[in-house]
Regions:
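Alpha-helix capping/hinge segments and adjacent helical runs
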Residues: 24-25, 415-427, 451-452, 456-462
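FAD-binding subdomain of flavoenzyme oxidoreductases
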Residues: 104-258, 476-484
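A glycine- and small-aliphatic-rich helix-loop capping segment at beta-alpha/alpha-beta transitions
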Residues: 86-103, 131-135, 158-169, 216-222, ...
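C-terminal substrate-recognition/cap domain of FAD-linked oxidoreductases
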Residues: 30-39, 218-222, 228, 232-406, ...
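N-terminal flexible segment immediately upstream of the FAD-binding catalytic core
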Residues: 1-67, 83-113, 264-274, 320-347, ...
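Activity-critical C-terminal alpha-helical subdomain
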Residues: 183, 433-484
């Protein structure tokens, strides 16, 4: 690959040498062939070419990197595991700062139920480390086997259990962060009490635009004494939606309530992630109840009755932990299973009122038919967080154009139903053009001003969250970072 290095510009090589002094030569990638895997995240339809990638192994190295980039006014993108679904952790011409080697769990306090972790700690690894204490980390995105706590903080990630337990912000007590200019700040506190303005709340969900987390203090949750997992199948989406509304209206708060449509069911069952879902069903609900053992039987019976009244064909209760894990594997791996259906996949993330589920899902089916595309739906029914999955071939310009049109129509439909454009995947590049659907120019300008408090030069993850025509960032960024 020696010839490949000749394509690296001299300024880039000089910067790579400075970075190598911090992390060692094996911690810097600069050849185009080495950077291929960092051109996109979990949404491969967006691809951007970084000029370099650097991988700090320790907190001091990360601090030195950010300060060097500040000194040279170089734009950068913090990146965790690259599992995001909004084109968030990529940009042309930037230095990509990979955080996956900062993966130490610094402390676990089982009495206070707190953990302090570095940003590269994998989500599920934290739960495994807390298990001996009877604790777990509640936010559980479908990518929890790979995604990092730092990435979860950037996106304010949720997961199937967020209705009852909350999203990432509800579990983050404090963040130590380095701002793009190299200043180190502490946001929040271990006690979880707000002092002054809620800057921690601003940082969580800022998509890497405000700086980089050095460590995160999170709240751990006690494992519930009893868990019951049910699978109900229906012959119509409307019946499953009615069951969802009935359960929530009853006062029972499920730990999770997930819906999958027939197309998704069949994709999962045809894959290595087959979970035993009925392939002739038009919809299934995966319902999980947890809490005190004393009331579990009664709540389970009530949920069963509501599903039957709504038209459930069969209801199955997991007999043991192995069966429960298998049912959840099908749901958690659904996006991966759809990779067999088509070479490319785009996933949307709109949120609508639960009561509008039947009509919005019917509209999505009509949009799919009209544009000649396949849309699979798998989502958090309990809070109306839809995840329409559209399979397509990016090498077919006509199909790609139809998919883009369909996505715009889906987003407009969800907003018209009283919803919003994202629940947990973030804005990234994917939803920039949809921001004016829900925010006025004045609101977008206010967001720009907030960003400039943390990052006046707008070098940290440039071109994200706020449409560029609403912000000075596009005009201030170096041409290399703008792809021109």
């Amino acid at each position: 690959m020696a010839n490949d290095s000749t394509t690296v510009p001299t300024p880039t090589r000089e910067l790579a040498e400075r970075l190598a002094e911090i992390v060692g030569p094996r911690g810097v990638l600069q050849r185009p062939s080495e950077l291929v895997v960092y051109r996109s995240d979990g949404l491969p339809g967006y691809a951007k070419q970084p000029q370099l990638a650097v991988f700090p192994r320790a907190r001091d190295e990360l601090i030195a990197i950010v300060r060097l980039l500040a000194e040279r006014r170089v734009p950068f993108v913090p990146r965790g595991a690259g599992t995001g679904l909004s084109g968030g952790a990529l940009a042309d011409g930037v230095v990509l700062v990979g955080l996956n080697r900062l993966n130490r769990i610094l402390s676990i306090d089982p009495v206070e139920r707190l953990a302090v972790v570095e940003p590269g700690v994998v989500n599920v690894a934290l739960t495994r480390a807390a298990t001996p204490y009877g604790l777990h980390y509640a936010p559980d995105p479908s990518s929890q086997a790979a995604c990092t706590i730092g990435g979860n903080v950037a996106e304010n990630a949720g997961g199937p259990h967020c209705l009852k337990y909350g999203v990432t912000l509800n579990h983050v007590r404090a963040v130590t962060a380095i701002l793009p200019d190299g200043e180190i700040i502490r946001l929040g506190n271990a006690a979880g009490e707000a002092d002054g303005y809620d800057l921690l709340g601003a940082f969580v969900g800022s998509e890497g635009c405000f700086g980089v987390a050095l460590d995160v203090t999170v709240r751990l949750s006690p494992n519930p004494p009893a868990v019951r997992t049910l699978l109900a199948d229906f012959m119509s989406i409307g019946a499953a939606a009615r069951a969802t509304s009935a359960i929530i209206a009853s006062g029972i708060v499920p730990a999770a309530l997930e819906m999958m449509d027939g197309a998704t069911i069949r994709a999962v069952e045809a894959s290595i992630y087959a979970a035993g879902y009925p392939v002739d069903a038009e919809a299934i609900l995966l319902i999980e109840l947890d809490g005190l053992a004393a009331g579990m039987d009664a709540d389970t019976a009530r949920v069963e009755a509501m599903c039957q009244e709504a038209g459930a064909r069969t209801i199955r209760i997991a007999r043991d932990e192995a069966e429960r894990a298998r049912l959840w594997q099908g749901r958690k791996k659904a996006f991966g299973a759809m990779g067999r259906v088509s070479p490319h996949l785009v996933v949307q993330d709109a949120v609508i009122p639960r009561t509008r589920l039947p009509e919005v899902l019917a509209s999505i089916r009509e949009i799919a038919t009209r544009h000649g595309i396949t849309i699979c739906n798998v989502f958090h029914a309990d809070d109306g967080n839809l995840h329409p999955n559209i399979g397509y071939d990016a090498n077919d310009p006509d199909e790609q154009a139809r998919v883009q049109t369909a996505m715009r129509e889906i987003m407009a439909t969800c907003v018209a139903a009283g919803g919003t454009i994202t629940g947990e995947h973030g804005i990234g590049l994917d939803k920039l053009d949809y921001m004016p659907l829900i925010f006025s120019d004045e609101s977008l300008a206010a967001m720009c001003r907030l960003r400039e408090v943390f990052d006046p030069d707008r070098r940290s993850n440039p071109g994200k969250v706020i449409p560029i025509h609403s912000c000075r960032e596009w005009h201030a960024a170096p041409k290399a970072a703008r792809g021109v």
